[in-house]
Amino acid sequence: MPASIPRRNIVGKEKKSRILTKPCVIEYEGQIVGYGSKELRVETISCWLARTIIQTKHYSRRFVNNSYLHLGVFSGRDLVGVLQWGYALNPNSGRRVVLETDNRGYMELNRMWLHDDMPRNSESRAISYALKVIRLLYPSVEWVQSFADERCGRAGVVYQASNFDFIGSHESTFYELDGEWYHEITMNAIKRGGQRGVYLRANKERAVVHKFNQYRYIRFLNKRARKRLNTKLFKVQPYPK
């Protein structure tokens, strides 16, 4: 065993997260493009690349048009994940969660995918590094949110490990048709549904209806925003199991 590598940093049968180099800001041609270490870092990538990976790797097989910050997760020279950040499905809904929030005052983690072979805790580290990038590139963002989908069989373990606050859940209806999943908004919103909505409505009788909980998590980036949480609708609660 090389003396230069501490025993605690060696990856064995358990996929233990390791940091062998100090995380730092990553710049390219004088511009901030990411944050992290050689072993794990996030960097901005093109929209088309992020969408391609999400379409092929994410369980939903669908990207979100509202995303405008696309971060690749790298280990060494390998691209091992993608995080897409942007507006909520309804961009103006941020002010309903945190009072006095405009569209540029928050972000939603729309999509996240990380390779299964990555060490344990890699997802929470990637989120942590992404938040540092957001603070640097989008200083007007005061808070971020994301949803854990019950379809994945978990209640948001990754967000709990990333020190997000759990502020409630709601039940959403999904339609399963010909191997594709459709959110209820695709059925109900004529303009937003597009051709997928047209197809779903035309074949509604064949679709299988599912109801799943979606768990809402929020991470405040400053204390002022925390004080403006709309406590009439949301409150910080114990983590769901």
Swiss-Prot record:
Record annotation: effect of changing residue 149 to A: Loss of iron-binding
Induction: Expressed in the late phase of the viral replicative cycle. Mom gene must be expressed very efficiently only at a very late stage in the lytic cycle because its expression is lethal to the host cell. Expression of Mom requires the viral late transcription activator C and the host deoxyadenosine methylase Dam. Dam methylates three viral sites upstream of the mom promoter to prevent binding of the host translational repressor OxyR. If the viral sites are not fully methylated, the host translational repressor OxyR prevents RNAP recruitment by the transactivator C.
Catalytic activity: a 2'-deoxyadenosine in DNA + acetyl-CoA + AH2 + NH4(+) + O2 = a N(6)-methylcarbamoyl-2'-deoxyadenosine in DNA + A + CoA + 2 H2O + H(+)
Subcellular location: Host cytoplasm
Top-level taxonomy: Viruses, Duplodnaviria, Heunggongvirae, Uroviricota, Caudoviricetes
Role, per record: Iron-binding protein that performs methylcarbamoylation of adenine using acetyl CoA. This chemical modificaltion makes the viral DNA resistant to a variety of host type I and type II restriction enzymes by modifying approximately 15% of DNA adenine residues. The modification called momylation changes adenine for N6-methylcarbamoyl adenine and occurs just before packaging. Target sequences are 5'-(C or G)-A-(Cor G)-N-(C or T)-3'. Also usually modifies adenine residues in the host cellular DNA.
Binding site residues for Fe cation: 59, 149, 159
Disulfide topology: none
Key words, A-Z: Host cytoplasm, Host-virus interaction, Inhibition of host innate immune response by virus, Iron, Late protein, Metal-binding, Restriction-modification system evasion by virus, Transferase, Viral immunoevasion
Cofactors: Fe(2+); Fe(3+)
Entry's Gene Ontology molecular function annotations: metal ion binding; transferase activity
Cellular compartments per GO CC: host cell cytoplasm
Co-factor binding details: Mn(2+), Zn(2+), Mg(2+), Ca(2+), Co(2+) and Cu(2+) showed undetectable interaction.
Superkingdom, natural source: Viruses
Family to which this protein belongs: Belongs to the mulikevirus mom protein family.
Protein name stated in the entry: Methylcarbamoylase mom
GO biological processes: symbiont-mediated evasion of host restriction-modification system; symbiont-mediated suppression of host innate immune response
